[in-house]
Amino acid sequence: MSQIRAIVGTQWGDEGKGKIVDFLAKEADVVVRAQGGSNAGHTVEAFGKIFKLHLIPSGILYKDKINIIGNGVVIDPESLIEEIESLQKEGISTENLRISDRAHLVMPYHKILDEEQEKQRGEESLGTTKRGIGPAYTDKTERTNLRVCDMLDEDEFVHKLRIVYERKNRILTEVYHKTPMKFGELLEQFMKYGEILRPYITDTIKLLNDAIKEGKKILLEGAQATMLDLDYGTYPYVTSSHPTVGGFCIGAGIAPKHIQEVIGVVKSYTTRVGKGPFPTELLDRVGDSIRERGKEYGTTTGRPRRCGWLDLVVVRYAVLINGIDKIALTKLDTLSNLPKVKVCVGYRHAGKILDLFPASLKVAMECEPIYEEFDGWSEEEIKKAKEYDQLPKNAKKYIEFIEKETGAKVFLIGTGASREDIIIKEN
C-alpha cells in the first residue's frame, strides 16, 4: 500500500517546511509540489551549502527521488530554468524532475500587471511578491491562460496567445502607460523555454497515480501556509492558491482518500510578510531580536518578516482545517536565551474569548492576545541536545503545552539550521 504524507504550513508561511520536507524525503520515493509559484521560497541547508528553492521540490537534493511540479503550480519558465541551472552548477542533478503538462504559465505581462496593480492600490496594497502569481491565477480562472503543454506546440501557442495578446497590450498601454509587448518576441521566448524544459514535461497525474498503485512513498510539499489560503486565510492578505491539504489534492491530481498522514509545520514563534492582521506581533526589542536570531528575511523578496509570539489560536485553526495528525516544530533554538517566552492561547474581543481565528479582518485587527508565560532556556542546552530527553526542562514544558493545546503530537523538533539539527520525539 502506498504511503502519502502531506506537509502543510500552519501559520503565514516561512515555518521551515523546506527543511522538514528535506528530512522526510529520505524515506520517500516521490516529492510533489502542488500549488503556488515562484512567490514561495524554501531554504534548505545541505552539503555545507544553502539552497534556496522557489519552484522545485526540496527532494531534488536527493539523487534517487522523483520530484514533481504539479498541475496546480503556476510556472514562470524563466525562473524555473534559472533554478535548474543554479542547482546543476552546484552539482545537483535535475534529471529526476518532472513538470506537469497541465500546469499554467506565468507570462511576462502577468509580472508587469502584478507590480502596477500593487502601485495602484496605494495604501491598500496587499504586499505581493510582484512575481505575477495573482494575475496568472486570475487568467487561469477566466480560462484565458496558457499552459505548459502549449509551449510544446507552436501552432497551439500562437492560437492561444493571439486571443489574449491585444487585450493585454491595451491594458498595459492605456491603463498603465507601459511599453506594448511584441508578439514575435513573446513567441520566440516561450518556444525556447519549451525546448529547454521539454525533457522534464510529462503527464504527472498518470505518473503520480501509477506510483500510488505501485505502493510508492509520496510526500506532498506545501508552499505558503494555511493563513495565506484564499478561502481560509486573512483575506484579502492571502495568496491566490490553496496551501491547505484540499488544495494539494487538486494541485497534484490525487484523490483525498490516498492521504494517510498530515504533518503540520509550526514555527516556535510566528512571522508574516506584508500586510494583514497579526495579533501576537512584537514591535519591540524582543521582536527585533527574534528577527535577527532567526534570520527572518524573505527567501524570495529579502523583506524583513514581522515577528511575534507563537499563536496557538492560529495553529489550532490550521489543525482543524487540515486534519493535522502530527506537528513538526521548527526553530526552537531561535527562542533561546530569552528570560520569558509567551504563547497566545486565545483572543479577547468585545468582552468575548475567541479560541479560533475570526473571519472578519476588522475583528482580527482588534483582537487582544491572551498569553501563557514560560521560563526560557539557554542556547547551549538546546545545541547539546540530540534526543528529546536531553532538551532543557523548560523547552519540554513549552513543547508539551503546544501538544495539549492543539491536540496534535509533536514528533520532530528543529534545533538549528542544518538538516542534521532535528530531534525525533517518540510518542
UniProtKB/Swiss-Prot annotation:
EC number: 6.3.4.4
Cofactor(s) needed for function: Mg(2+)
Cofactor detail note: Binds 1 Mg(2+) ion per subunit.
Function (record text): Plays an important role in the de novo pathway of purine nucleotide biosynthesis. Catalyzes the first committed step in the biosynthesis of AMP from IMP.
Binding-site list for GTP: 13-19, 41-43, 305, 331-333, 414-416
Protein name in the entry: Adenylosuccinate synthetase
Uppermost EC category: ligase
GO MF entries: adenylosuccinate synthase activity; GTP binding; magnesium ion binding
Species whose genome carries this gene: Caldicellulosiruptor saccharolyticus (strain ATCC 43494 / DSM 8903 / Tp8T 6331)
Gene this protein is translated from: purA
Lineage top rank: taxon: Bacteria
